């Protein structure tokens, strides 16, 4: 025994990536997926864009799915269905329950509909009861105060509910281990832009080390 609390054995990494075009970005996303063995890729609009371009998303969907990684599009169930993505990630908003209903109708019972509850316990419970495939909790700016709040929410949720909890919008990689210790089923990290595939591989290795996915086998 050590003095460290073992991480939840099922804690896994997910990646969040901007939907950019070109082979260079595809190579970076592929490198991140390979180095982390991420189980889910969430595609979000490119910086400055309000929607996801289907033509830019399609090659990223294909490269991830070839790696047995589920792909979700942020807030666009129709495009997700149209390009063969696995589902949608709904970001936190006032009408999140309505958005969930629309997305579920669009994708059907077999599509993945994950929801971001922000810091709202009420939204989390309502969406979990409605049938969301996971509930994500965010952390604001990612400082220590926000980390405390996010950790508390995940610990509360994991003790009471069976719907998977996702630690979303995670700040520094150093926060990963603590969130896993609190009971997060998935840890979602954003793939940095403006770096080489080699630098991304190093970043990814640090994320894997932080989450200690295979800690229980040690």
Residue ranges of model-derived segments:
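Conserved catalytic cores of soluble enzyme domains
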Residues: 108, 147-161
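Conserved N-terminal beta1-alpha1 strand-loop-helix module at the mouth
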Residues: 1-89, 94-95, 106-113, 119-132, ...
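Active-site phosphate/pyrophosphate- and oxyanion-stabilizing loops and adjacent acidic/basic residues
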Residues: 30, 101, 155
């Amino acid at each position: 025994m050590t003095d460290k609390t073992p991480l939840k054995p099922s804690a896994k990494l997910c990646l969040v990536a901007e939907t950019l075009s070109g082979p260079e970005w595809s190579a970076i996303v592929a490198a991140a997926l390979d180095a982390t063995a991420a189980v889910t890729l969430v595609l979000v609009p490119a910086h400055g864009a309000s929607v996801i371009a289907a033509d830019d998303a399609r090659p990223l969907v294909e490269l991830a799915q070839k790696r047995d990684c589920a792909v979700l599009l942020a807030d666009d169930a129709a495009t997700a269905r149209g390009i063969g993505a696995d589902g949608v990630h709904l970001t936190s908003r006032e009408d999140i329950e309505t958005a969930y209903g629309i997305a579920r109708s669009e994708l059907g019972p077999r599509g993945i509909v994950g929801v971001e509850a922000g810091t709202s316990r009420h939204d989390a419970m309502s969406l979990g009861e409605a049938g969301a495939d996971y509930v994500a909790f965010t952390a604001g700016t990612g400082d220590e105060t926000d980390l405390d709040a996010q950790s508390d929410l995940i610990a509360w949720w994991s003790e009471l509910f069976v719907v998977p909890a996702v630690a979303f919008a995670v700040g520094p990689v150093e926060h990963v281990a603590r969130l896993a210790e609190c009971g997060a089923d998935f840890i979602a990290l954003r793939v940095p832009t403006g770096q080489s595939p080699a630098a991304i591989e190093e970043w990814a290795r640090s994320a894997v080390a932080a989450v200690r996915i295979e800690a229980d086998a040690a």
